Curated annotation (Swiss-Prot):
Physiological role: Catalyzes the reversible isomerization of glucose-6-phosphate to fructose-6-phosphate.
A Gene Ontology BP annotation from the UniProt entry: glycolytic process
Molecular functions per Gene Ontology: carbohydrate derivative binding; glucose-6-phosphate isomerase activity; monosaccharide binding
Catalytic machinery residues: 330, 359, 461
Entry EC no(s): 5.3.1.9
Pathway: Carbohydrate biosynthesis; gluconeogenesis; Carbohydrate degradation; glycolysis; D-glyceraldehyde 3-phosphate and glycerone phosphate from D-glucose: step 2/4
SUPFAM superfamilies with a match to the protein in the record: SIS domain
Protein name: Glucose-6-phosphate isomerase
Catalyses which reaction(s): alpha-D-glucose 6-phosphate = beta-D-fructose 6-phosphate
A single cellular component GO annotation: cytosol
Organism expressing this protein natively: Synechococcus sp. (strain CC9605)
Length: 532
């Protein structure tokens, strides 16, 4: 495991490190270069015993071990692209059958065989999903949809009323021909439920027929699945209980959008499967995900002390940094390790796209605080319909900007790694996602945290539910028309805090809900609120 130590000023050493630390997959046409990370041979030697344990843990996970003890469930997203790895023949058949059903449904909607209830072809898709159920589909659409192919997509990925209003306004006149897909694993998550009810209300008001336009992606026998069965929805697809939202893109959550834009979803799965095979290798120097995880660990001192800046030099990958933000931060951002010790682990992720970012925050990356490492992503092949004009080729400039930024960062002693792809399509997107999924899993093992649960997210959901409950009680107190301060309401309730009650009242008075406020807003304690 010998290669030169990092040197920012010696071009010969940089070249030698590039040759020694480059990984390449011939069939996929994918390179990984970690030579500009400050990783030395001694670092990899020191990590080797822990990486060996990480390889073994990942092997157990793929074999069906309980990987998420909090929920006593398996973690099986790797089975989705290689069904024969699933621990039972019944499960293998179920996965394969779902893929076939998704592909057939998408094809039949796109070619007009499956029609809207009014007898016309579907014109649009309204996708309702939060977190990974929204980010994964958004990535699929941005990365893989070609102009004029498949159906246009519109998203409810938040409960912002203004956002919903804008989306619905954009569907005006086509709501009765819009396919509405609601994604909710448990069927009980508030955000997709609220979006679904708003979509149903507007669709039916426009003359649509909900059951004939609605599709559910959820666990079998969940609340949403039961509702879809009872109401006779157009289609239901399974969201397996052993697939987490942030790793659900190779399930129906990502495959259905792919099928509805005319993408070959089997190519997408094939790319992920090929990268899974490459990252399954228990050899640190020959496993790209292990090289990435080791680089992250060394760069951040095993404590996430450096942010990951994602710089894909293609517009199609503009959503990828946000997708990785959830995958990495929700997986690795943990207060406790598996021993119950407080560790506050995590890697912060941000980014957008090159070369746009060179005119934004790259200034700080080069000259400001050195608290990050960059991840460049390049695609070599350019489209053929953008010609060279007056000797100037946009693709050459894009490549030059990437190399220039990479060199400028190195000159400043800033760390980076680069992923290069010969071309970009569904197969390469699948491979790219699988590469990061495995790197996240391996890193989680290196720092001894559970990368497959999200207690912080659950805590936020419980706190939100408590606020909504408090709001109902505040409204009940004010129903008598008597003006009260936040403190008086708290005393009457015997619960809550002045601040949370003030926030609730400020929201209520900001909308036409019949509540009014008197006093000086700059003096919150002086404000009095009433209804009527």
């Amino acid at each position: 495991m010998s290669f030169p130590d990092f040197s920012a000023s010696d071009a010969h050493i940089q070249w030698q490190r590039f040759c020694d630390l480059s990984w390449y997959h011939d069939d996929l046409g994918v390179w990984l270069d970690i030579s500009r990370m400050h990783v030395n041979a001694s670092d990899l030697q020191q990590l080797q015993p822990r990486m060996d344990k990480a390889f073994a843990a990942m092997q157990e996970l793929e074999a069906g071990a309980i990987a998420n003890p909090d929920e006593q469930r398996q973690v099986g997203h790797y089975w989705l692209r290689t069904p024969e790895l699933a621990p039972s023949s019944e499960l293998q058949q179920h996965i394969s059958r779902e893929i076939d059903l998704i592909a057939a449904f998408g094809r039949d909607v796109v070619n007009g065989t499956i029609k809207a209830p009014n007898g016309e072809a579907f014109t649009d898709v309204l996708w309702i999903g939060i977190g990974g159920s929204g980010l994964g589909p958004a990535l699929m659409i941005k990365a893989l949809q070609n102009p004029g192919e498949g159906l246009p997509f519109h998203f409810f990925d938040n409960v912002d009323p203004n956002g919903m209003s804008n989306v619905l306004a954009g569907l005006e006149g086509r709501l009765d021909r819009t396919l509405v897909v609601t994604v909710s694993k448990s069927g009980g998550t508030p955000e997709p439920h609220l979006g679904m009810e708003q979509a149903r209300h507007r669709l039916e008001a426009a003359g649509g027929q909900w059951a004939g336009q609605a599709v559910a992606v959820t666990m079998l026998d969940s609340k949403l699945d039961q509702q879809a069965q009872k109401e006779g929805w157009l289609k239901r697809f399974d969201m397996f209980d052993w697939v987490g939202g942030r790793t659900s893109i190779t399930s129906a959550v990502g495959l259905l959008p792919g099928a509805l834009i005319g993408c070959d979803i089997r190519d997408f799965l094939s790319g992920a499967s090929q990268m899974d095979a490459a990252t399954r290798m228990a050899d640190l120097r020959r496993n790209p995900a292990a090289l990435m995880a080791a680089s992250w660990h060394v760069a951040g001192g095993g404590r996430g002390q450096r942010d990951m800046v994602v710089l894909p030099y293609r517009d199609r990958l503009e959503v990828f940094s946000r997708y990785l933000q959830q995958l990495v931060m929700e997986s690795l951002g943990k207060r406790l390790d598996r021993n119950g010790d407080v560790v506050h682990q995590g890697i912060a992720v941000y980014g957008n796209k090159g070369s746009t970012d060179q005119h934004a925050y790259v200034q700080q990356l080069r000259d400001g605080v050195d608290n990050f490492f960059a991840t460049f992503i390049e695609v070599l092949e350019d489209v053929s319909d953008i010609p060279t004009i007056s000797g100037e080729c946009p693709g050459d400039f894009l490549d030059g900007f990437l190399q220039g930024t990479r060199s400028a960062l190195t000159e400043s002693g800033r760390q980076s790694m680069t992923i290069s792809m010969r071309c970009f399509d569904a197969r390469r997107l699948g491979a790219l996602i699988a590469l990061f999924e495995r790197a996240v899993g391996l890193y989680g093992e290196l720092v001894n945290i559970n990368a497959y649960h999200q207690p912080g997210v659950e805590a936020g959901k419980k706190a939100a539910a408590a606020i909504l409950n408090l709001q109902g009680r505040v409204e009940a107190i004010l129903a008598d028309g008597v003006a009260r301060s936040a403190d008086e309401i708290r005393l009457a309730l015997g619960d809550g805090t002045d601040e949370s009650i003030f926030w609730i009242l400020r929201h209520l008075t900001g909308n036409q809900r019949g509540f009014s406020a008197q006093g000086d807003w700059s003096q919150p304690a002086s404000m009095r609120f009433s209804k009527g």
